[in-house]
Amino acid sequence: MDIIRPSIETKELLDHYLQYNHYRGCEFSAANSLFWCDFYQTKFTILEDMLVFCRVEDGIPTSFTFPIGEHDPKDAFDRVVDYFEQSNLPFAMYMVEPEMFEMIERWYPGQYQIEYDRDSADYLYRQESLATLAGKKPVSYTHLRAHETRSNL
């Protein structure tokens, strides 16, 4: 399995596979992969003509994403499972969305479980809230504005 570090040279390859991505994670973009790969120690591999990102610790892939591409992801998923079995590492995937887990459950009923990692959760915002920056103001800002108003009387 060739493990590849995202780079400018691999951007076109990433873009090719990521055009088939239908999942919501912002991590599934070539730009984010290039920008964050060193910080999060992420790399990628191509298995069965499918893109699979992986987290690396001490040069060893320790967890993978669900395969992305135009083909059926089952064969690539099976290659990931084989990797863990051959490496004697515990099976681990990250960024598994409900639709992905449903596929895994159809292929291998009851064999895998999913755990929610709140520390890795994305935040959702309403467009209107971001556009108007509506929301509770910091207490110090509120007090400052009240003080300014009284001073101008």
Walk through the language-model features, giving the residues of each.
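Amide-forming acyltransferase catalytic core, primarily the GNAT-like/NAT-type
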Residues: 1-48
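Conserved donor-binding loop and adjoining core beta-sheet/short helix segment
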Residues: 29-99
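Short acidic (Asp/Glu) patches
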Residues: 77-78, 106-110
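Short, glycine/charge-rich beta-strand/loop segments that flank catalytic centers
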Residues: 90-106, 118-121
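Short, His- and charge-rich active-site/binding loops that engage polyanionic ligands
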Residues: 137
